[in-house]
Every structure is written in structure tokens, then in C-alpha cells.
Amino acid sequence: MLRIENLDKRYKTGDRALKDVSLSIGAGDIVGLIGPSGAGKSTLIRCVNRLVQPTGGSIRLGDTELTRLGGTELRKARRRMGMIFQEFALIERLTVMENVLSGRLGYVGFWASWFRRFPQADVQRAFALLARVGLSEQVDKRADALSGGQRQRVGIARALAQDPELLLIDEPTASLDPKTSRQVMRLITELCAERGLAAIVNIHDVALAQLFLPRIVGLRAGEVVYDGPASGLTPDVLTRIYGEEDWSKTSDEDADSVDAPPRAADLPASLKLDPALARL
């Protein structure tokens, strides 16, 4: 379905963002990308849809070599890839429905897109998608009036309106609270399963990735250092991806060690309260 071989990206500054990255994704596969900041996760996703031009290597979507495309052929190939962004990338002044229909812009003529006149079949499909993501009651609401979770659901519906073969998902939960993050990830995985869609999900939350994504690819300094099941993310593997850390400590224990106030018995004598004053 998607095959990446020896992918490289080097910027004009000389920085090498990706180093010989190779991986294959089959139809219906959902793959999580994890790694520290600057590991190349977003760059990899953007190389696939050619928002970033690779320096070397091959990216094949089916029988199409994406790295060689330009102009009309590249636009046609991008129809096959739906993009879901961290910051939603909605047009704030447009309604929810208009934002979803923008996913069909690659399929209609210039004047139809200019006047936002879409075929009835596209409109009906947009209604169905909004119902599926739980936004039937928000169809005519402006995008800037929505909550973060609702905005991301619009972004998901817009990507699906393209009728893609592959979803490229860049930090879909970074701006969301924990509960909404779980709801969004659950929705994404359910929709991929229903439609047989492949997906690459760049995600910073390892626990969330382990909960929802069956296969994990770990990047460090632009290189693949792990490619396997989520259950294989042992402390040793996480250290290989992120560097040294006590992975046995829970977040609660970390919080206790950082935030817990000192006990009176541990204070220096100069800071201890006189017992007589304590009774006042």
C-alpha cells in the first residue's frame, strides 16, 4: 500500500532530518510514530504527501512513485491521502459544513470551488460524515465557535471527505485534554477499521499510542530505532527512542517527588516554626 525506502531529508543548513528511513504499511494498517522533539516525525509525514521535498529515497503509494510527481499528477496523488493536522487547519469564518466540503475541492472545477457549489452527492456525504463524528447539530456553526475536540472532529470529517486510501495524522491530540484525546483516538481507529484505511499517526503521548495503536515506529535523530508491536515498548526500547529515563516510575510518583511539600521534620532549624507560635 505505502512503501518507503531509504528516505532522506537534508535541509540547506546541512541538518539531516531523516536518515535512510524504510518502512512498509499495508491496507488497513494503523502505525504510530513516536520519538523526542526533532526526531523527524512530522517531517516524515510531510515527505509522504510532498509538503516537504525529500532529498533522496523512494515513497510509493500503490504503484505511484510520489517523489517524482509534480503539478497535476501530484495534486491527483494528494487526493488519495487525507491529512489531519495538530492545529486543525480549519477556515475559521466558514461553517462546519463548508469546512468538510473543502475536502472535495480537488474533485470539482475552479468556479464550483470558488462559489462553494458542490454536487449533491458530496453534500449528502458530508452530512453522513458529520453524523458519524458526532457533529450533526453543529452543521451551520462557524468553525471558530467550536471547542478543540469538535474542531478536530471537523478535521477528521474533512479528511474522510476526500475518500482517501491513507490518512496522515500529525499530533491529533496535542491541543486536547486527556478525555477528549482518548475520544478522538478512539474515533480515528474506529473509522480506519470501518473503511479499511491505512494511517500514520504522529503522536507524542506514548501511553495513548500504546492504548490505541497496534504498531509503533520509534524515531530518534531521524532514524528508525524501533518498529514493532505496542506491547514491545519495554523500558529498554523507550530508552533507545528517548534516551535515559527511569521508565519504571509512574507519573504520580514523579509528581510526588516534584510537587510534594517538605515535611516539618526535614526543614532546617532556622525555618522550623516555634511550637508556641503554632498554637496561635
Swiss-Prot record:
Name assigned to this protein: Phosphonates import ATP-binding protein PhnC 1
Membrane topology, from the record: Peripheral membrane protein
Protein species of origin: Rhodopseudomonas palustris (strain HaA2)
A GO CC term assigned to this protein in UniProt: plasma membrane
One Gene Ontology molecular-function label: ABC-type phosphonate transporter activity
Highest taxon listed in the record's lineage: Bacteria
Compartmental location: Cell inner membrane
Gene3D superfamilies for this protein: P-loop containing nucleotide triphosphate hydrolases
Function of the protein: Part of the ABC transporter complex PhnCDE involved in phosphonates import. Responsible for energy coupling to the transport system.
CDD domains: ABC_PhnC_transporter
Matching PANTHER family: AMINO ACID IMPORT ATP-BINDING PROTEIN, PHOSPHONATES IMPORT ATP-BINDING PROTEIN PHNC
NCBIfam families in the record: ABC_phnC
Family recorded in the similarity comment: Belongs to the ABC transporter superfamily. Phosphonates importer (TC 3.A.1.9.1) family.
A Pfam short name: ABC_tran
InterPro entries the record matches: AAA+_ATPase, ABC_transporter-like_ATP-bd, ABC_transporter-like_CS, ABC_transpr_PhnC, MetN_ABC_transporter-like, P-loop_NTPase
